[in-house]
Amino acid sequence: MRYPMSKLAYHRVLLKLSGEALMGSADYGIDPKVINRLAGEVIEAQNAGAELALVIGGGNIFRGAGLAAKGMDRVTGDHMGMLATIINALAMQDALEKLGTKVRVMSAIKINNVCEDFIRRRAIRHLEKSRITIFAAGTGNPFFTTDSGAALRAIEIGADLLLKATKVDGIYNKDPQKHCDAVKYSTLSYDEVISQNLEVMDTAAFALARDSNLPLRIFDIEQPGVLLRILHGEEIGTLVKERNSKS
């Protein structure tokens, strides 16, 4: 059942998933049960009337920065990481299509026999036609993370909200896994994140979001139904925005 768009707090969103989110309890690769569950969450949100774009990291398959630290050429490593994100995008496309929805994968690097090139106007048209759109290969440039790619694409498509899915239910003043007295923030401004040196996403990605006044919500993707609840305005996780923003 599709609900009226007016019932949603956010109509067009970009969801950033880490590659590790696809692994489940495994040490490498993609757990079919996990990716199918995540696909179900995305479909549920789409059925509520949302326009959904996704960016998926590649860390479950390859981390270019890690091997660069051990001597591999950084540019080569980052290009390999981009290919890993395409693998994950195709896997998610397959999982979503098996649930009966239309999906497009758009890559920042040319791989035309596999997926479309990223063209901004075409991406927006896909979203307007209720096609879930997955952006792969980051920004297409080395030295930029998939967080930066997610922030950039969210701005380009005019997203109402950038969602960063993690295994922690928000932003804390210190690591909640190490400190039992860690305090969770419900809302933060961009300046507060910077002044408190809180780790939200990499600096380039955060600067893009801040400069474009793009609201960012950090949340735990492992909670069932959480994506739909956020789209309907529930205060889940931590929202980062300018203090004068109404989002």
Swiss-Prot record:
Record bears the keyword Cytoplasm: yes
Location in or out of the cell: Cytoplasm
GO cellular component terms, semicolon-separated: cytosol
Disulfide bond residue pairs: none
Regulation of its activity: Inhibited by UTP.
UniProt enzyme class: transferase
Pathway: Pyrimidine metabolism; CTP biosynthesis via de novo pathway; UDP from UMP (UMPK route): step 1/1
Catalytic activity as recorded in UniProt: UMP + ATP = UDP + ADP
Domain of life of the native organism: Bacteria
Gene3D superfamilies: Acetylglutamate kinase-like
Pfam families linked to this entry: AA_kinase
GO molecular function: ATP binding; UMP kinase activity
Residues given in the record as ATP binding sites: K16, L17, S18, G19, G59, R63, T166, Y172, D175
Residue sites binding UMP per the record: G58, D78, T139, G140, N141, P142, F143, F144, T145, T146
Keyword Transferase: yes
Chief localization: cytoplasm
EC number: 2.7.4.22
UniProt cross-references to CDD domains, sorted A to Z: AAK_UMPK-PyrH-Ec (cd04254)
One GO term of the biological process aspect: 'de novo' CTP biosynthetic process
Keywords: ATP-binding, Cytoplasm, Kinase, Nucleotide-binding, Pyrimidine biosynthesis, Transferase
Complexes and interactors: Homohexamer.
Family: Belongs to the UMP kinase family.
Function of the protein: Catalyzes the reversible phosphorylation of UMP to UDP.
Name of protein: Uridylate kinase
